[in-house]
Amino acid sequence: ILRCLVGSEMCIRDSNADNSSQAESMVDESGIDESLTDSSVTHDDADDLSDAVFIGDSRTVGLQNNCDKPKATFLCSVGMHIDTVMTDQNITLSNGNAGTVIDALGERQYGRVYINLGTNELGWPYIDTFKDYYTQLITKIQEIQPDAVIYAESILPVTASRSLQGDAINNTNVATFNQAISEVAQQTGINYLDCTSAVAGADGTLPEEASSDGIHLMSEYCDKWLNYIIDNT
């Protein structure tokens, strides 16, 4: 089941079944590619992801919209933050009521849990605070999903032009926060999944053609991202 809040509307779709307000608005108001469904990248059909759940912000919403994996579960929302992911009631539960990501995770057991959070937090001044909230989330997931393999994904890079705009959404901050995520993964005993190479060019940045706003991925690059996840987990 896809359960997500896109924009201001709660939604549930059958799929089997930021602390800087400036940074947040720049990520969330930029739009998600939902129209480019054709892709030159072949979908990896060997894994239907029926045992997988994806937790994340608008980039994960974009992944769901373009990945053609109807049996995967997506618990995602535009503007999802690490400090409120466990308390915001922005997920539609199986009974139709609004609930948290944690509530939704309690409805069934998964084999794999993928977390992609941090883009909206790139403006946070205190990296230790980010790490504390990330650790709390992982600890709670481990409690609710004791048999699941948990993957903390890296924050994907942004384009070079987006990185040079002079705000918090830049690749220097991406690298800093990814180091923090890697450290949290090691400390909590989960897996750190560096997806950068799946979408980055030779210079380590997101290619300009990969995104209409420098942040959110076009369909082809969503396929590259998902194929990397499938091939490496």
Residue ranges and their predicted role:
Residues 1-14:
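Single conserved hydrophobic/aromatic residue that forms the stacking wall/gate
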Residues 13-31, 35, 39-42:
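Intrinsically disordered, low-complexity serine/threonine-rich repeat tracts
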Residues 42, 46-133:
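Conserved SGNH/GDSL esterase-like catalytic core that processes O-acyl groups on lipids
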Residues 105, 141-143, 185:
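N-terminal cationic-hydrophobic initiation segments that often serve targeting/anchoring roles
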Residues 116, 153-154:
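Alpha/beta-hydrolase-fold catalytic nucleophile elbow
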Residues 134-138, 178:
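Generic structural signal for well-ordered alpha-helices
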Residues 145-149:
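A short helix->loop->beta-strand "cap" motif at the edges of active sites that frequently abuts
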Residues 158-233:
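Catalytic His-Asp segment of secreted/periplasmic serine-dependent ester chemistry enzymes
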